[in-house]
Amino acid sequence: MLKVLRGALCVALLGAVSGMFHAGAQDGTRTIEIHAKRFSFSPAEITLKKGEAVTLVLTSDDVPHSLVIDGLGVKGDMIKGQMTKVNVTPSKDGDFQGKCGRFCGGGHGSMRFTVHVTDN
């Protein structure tokens, strides 16, 4: 009887955890994964629509970094082995430049990221 209860509990927990990871897709929010490594972002540019809610999922593939996009109010730490979620809904169109906000070595200044926001 105890084995049956443990099995049922495991199935229930897996279902609950699975539901948490799919919540972003169910509410209509687009998710974009962005990785950082010395000395680049991948992808290096993305395109968003004005007024579109987007979740950026940030992670580092090596040392600590951060993504800063001043024109969109984005700032998120990027730590190896961790995911940082940053929500953004652009209110104006145009091109916005991002950069690494945490010194990560000699090529730090070359870490650039571009967000294109379209009106349609």
List each language-model region with its residue ranges.
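Beta-strand cores of secreted/periplasmic/IMS beta-sandwich domains, seen most often
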Residues: 28-33, 44-63, 82-92, 96
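Extracellular/periplasmic metallocenter environments
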Residues: 80-120
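C-terminal segment of classical bacterial N-terminal signal peptides
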Residues: 15-23
